[in-house]
Design a protein with these regions (language model features):
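Catalytic cores of alpha/beta
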Residues: 160, 212-224
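A mid-to-C-terminal "edge-of-domain" accessory segment
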Residues: 4-9, 260-544
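Hydrophobic faces of well-ordered beta-strands that scaffold small-molecule active sites
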Residues: 6-9, 42-46, 78-85, 115-116, ...
């Protein structure tokens, strides 16, 4: 019998890889007991990545959600883990050091055991401080290697980085195969190399199923010493998400590994409940193409979760490109033609930009450059004329060192614009900021929260936190949800009037007792806006305001 392999359910990433939003706290506390009852998970990914920000976007408190979701697993002896972007922490741009340090204190207090720390550039200067901060806070820092496939991303390249991260105190290494394009043979060899050099270090493999290599990769890393495998479950496994725990268990058991049994009754209950969450509201924000695998992803190397946004980008420029071609008497392009052009351009620009691993946010930067290049080429203009500031920051070294060399034409372009390349510690560009946020909370009369968690949330996601506190976020989300629901019904053949009738079917009309002017809300920033059809009101909740016109008061009104 071979070694024991444990499983981690990446419940958070299942959702992030499928769509825009995460389940609400009331849904999470319902699914947690079923995940525990399945009996096959040593770990569960509960938060991090976009989880906290998404809660704010629909007007909920992420701190309550994290505490409520982690508690059942803690009680059951199951470890919880979160995703952490190193210098960028829980957002898409750099975070001051004092805010990063506070994050680990807060998340440990909220019940999170492990933080998976990654940097899209595999820049150790962005990861090592987080290892130190996590250890100080009592968390387990799992240092991460972002896996991709290129001439510079060799076994020795990754093993050398792993050596540095382990020396800095990381007791665990994650192989984060975010696009699923890591070649199985290379991943097996890398796992073996790390284990030979550091036999006591735990290795956890995280791979996406989009291009179709993930099962072979899982088998290779397990044969070479991996300890834990990230898995998903139906109805959200496969596609561009992750392999299903049932398939992984069957494959590994057949090869002689010790793997846990799965309580299939609990699995089916959890499967049905997750589908219930999709049907409730989350499905409206899920891109159906994320349920499809695609070998095309091997060519461009982009994460499968980006396909939805990439197709939306292409659809947005498709008609404009064809208008340009039509004006030149050239044949128009189908959306598939355009997709192949974009993939080819990604393949062209990626090495010239220094082979940044194609993971958030650098995958977006490379994709955006490629898309802009395609548009410029169609117009008969030159490449590289539309590079945004964030991409320039990456090129110039402000996010850390690129794995490969920049092309001479990129270096010359930077010099022609008067830009300077830097090689300083990226954190040095972002001074401490907690005192400013404390001042803002004091001025607003806001509580810092248990373990300073509210202070942390403002400092990490300031704009979204302010919108959450003001109520703007919840209203915006409700409006967005109604729009996507209406759009879904229209796709199914309902007219706008039919949708209104359906929403009003069980409603009783409210008759105003007097004539006057209706004000739906008192707004100091904009016009009075009617509530969306279907909004529910509680007893004694204000429905609207009326300015009454009477003969005695007419002059005043």
């Amino acid at each position: 019998m071979k070694k024991e392999i444990k499983f981690s359910l990446v419940y958070r990433d299942m959702w992030q890889s499928s769509g825009k939003y995460q389940p609400r706290v009331d849904q999470l506390v319902r699914i947690a007991p079923l995940i525990i009852e399945m009996g096959c998970f040593a770990r569960v990914e509960t938060n991090g990545g976009a989880f906290e920000q998404v809660n704010l976007l629909y007007g909920e408190n992420p701190n309550k959600a994290v505490r409520a979701f982690t508690q059942p697993f803690k009680d059951a002896g199951i470890q919880t883990h979160m995703l952490d972007r190193g210098l960028n922490a829980l957002r898409m741009y750099p975070v001051p050091a004092d805010v990063r340090r506070l994050m680990y204190k807060v998340k440990h207090a909220q019940g999170v055991d492990i933080t998976r720390i990654f940097c899209g550039l595999n820049e150790t200067r962005n990861i090592i401080p987080s290892i130190r901060y996590a250890l100080e806070a009592g968390m387990i820092p799992q240092a991460t290697l972002c896996i991709t496939h290129s001439p510079v991303h060799t076994v020795e390249y990754y093993a050398r980085i792993a050596d540095q991260l382990i020396e800095a105190g990381a007791p665990e290494i994650c192989l984060k195969d975010m696009a699923g394009i890591g070649r199985p043979g290379m991943l097996g060899e890398l796992t073996k190399t790390i284990k030979e050099r550091h036999p006591d270090v735990l290795i956890q493999y995280h791979g996406h199923s989009g291009p179709g290599l993930s099962m072979a990769s899982i088998l290779e890393v397990c044969e070479n010493g991996a300890d834990i495998i990230d898995v998903a479950m139906e109805p959200m496994s496969w596609g561009k998400v992750h392999p299903d725990v049932i398939s992984v268990q069957a494959m590994l058991r057949d090869k002689g590994f010790q793997v846990p049994d799965i309580n299939m009754k609990a699995y089916m209950k959890a499967r049905a409940m997750t589908q219930e969450f999709i049907d409730d509201f989350l499905g409206y924000f899920m891109d159906p193409t994320n349920k499809h695998m695609s070998s095309l992803l091997l060519k461009c190397g982009l994460p499968g979760g980006m396909m939805g946004s990439m197709m939306a980008d292409l659809k947005g420029v498709h008609s404009g490109i064809n208008m340009i071609l039509k004006g030149k008497n050239q044949p128009e392009l189908s959306i598939d033609d355009l997709l192949v052009m974009l993939f080819d351009e990604v393949e062209y620009v990626w090495p010239k930009l220094g082979y940044p691993p194609l993971v958030t946010p650098f995958s977006q930067y490379v994709k955006n450059v490629a898309l802009m290049n395609v548009m410029q080429l169609v117009k008969g203009e030159e490449r590289w004329t539309m590079i945004d500031n964030h991409t320039w920051d990456m090129i110039l070294g402000k996010s850390g060192r690129l794995p490969g060399e920049l092309a001479p034409e990129i270096i010359e372009l930077a010099k022609s614009k008067g830009y300077e390349f830097v090689d300083t510690d990226p954190q040095s560009n972002y001074p401490d900021a907690l005192d400013d946020y404390r001042k803002e909370m004091d001025e607003n009369g806001w509580e810092y929260g248990e373990d300073d968690e509210e202070l942390f949330e403002l400092a990490m996601h300031d704009r979204q936190y302010r919108d959450y506190k003001s109520g703007v976020a919840k209203k915006r989300f409700q409006d967005e949800l109604e729009r996507v629901k209406d759009a879904s019904m229209m796709k199914n053949g309902y007219s706008e009037e039919e949708i209104k009738k359906l929403k009003r079917a069980k409603a009783d009309p409210i008759i105003a007792p007097s004539k006057g002017q209706v004000l739906w809300e008192v707004s100091v920033e904009g016009p009075s806006a009617a509530p969306f059809i279907g909004r529910k009101y509680q007893h004694d909740e204000v429905f609207c305001y009326c300015l009454l016109y009477t003969s005695d008061a007419a002059d005043d009104l």
